[in-house]
């Protein structure tokens, strides 16, 4: 089984069409990985599906980096 970090990075890579090796925990979805607002919505939906969880809109708005996504998933497993 992959770690949460590996799974988050895989989802990010697939959704944002970037290489996993180019994704750092500190990477910002918009500034470093080139996501626009639609990409971030789709990314949150993909994370919800991958981890079988629901991320409320007000929480989703706070998730702007890879590490924040990892932290959210860890806290809500």
From Swiss-Prot:
Entry's Gene Ontology BP terms: lipid A biosynthetic process
Compartment(s) of residence: Cytoplasm
Species: Chromohalobacter salexigens (strain ATCC BAA-138 / DSM 3043 / CIP 106854 / NCIMB 13768 / 1H11)
Gene from which the chain derives: acpP
Keywords assigned by UniProt, alphabetized: Cytoplasm, Fatty acid biosynthesis, Fatty acid metabolism, Lipid biosynthesis, Lipid metabolism, Phosphopantetheine, Phosphoprotein
GO molecular function ontology, one term from the record: acyl binding
Protein's name according to its UniProt entry: Acyl carrier protein
Pfam families for the chain: PP-binding
GO cellular component, as recorded: cytosol; membrane
Family: Belongs to the acyl carrier protein (ACP) family.
């Amino acid at each position: 089984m992959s770690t949460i970090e590996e799974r988050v990075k895989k989802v990010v890579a697939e959704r944002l069409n970037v290489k996993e090796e180019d994704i750092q925990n500190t990477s910002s979805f918009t500034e470093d990985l080139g996501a626009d607002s639609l990409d971030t919505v789709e990314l949150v939906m993909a994370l919800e599906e991958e981890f079988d969880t629901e991320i409320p809109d007000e929480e989703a708005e706070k998730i702007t980096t890879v590490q924040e996504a990892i932290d959210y998933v860890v806290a809500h497993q």
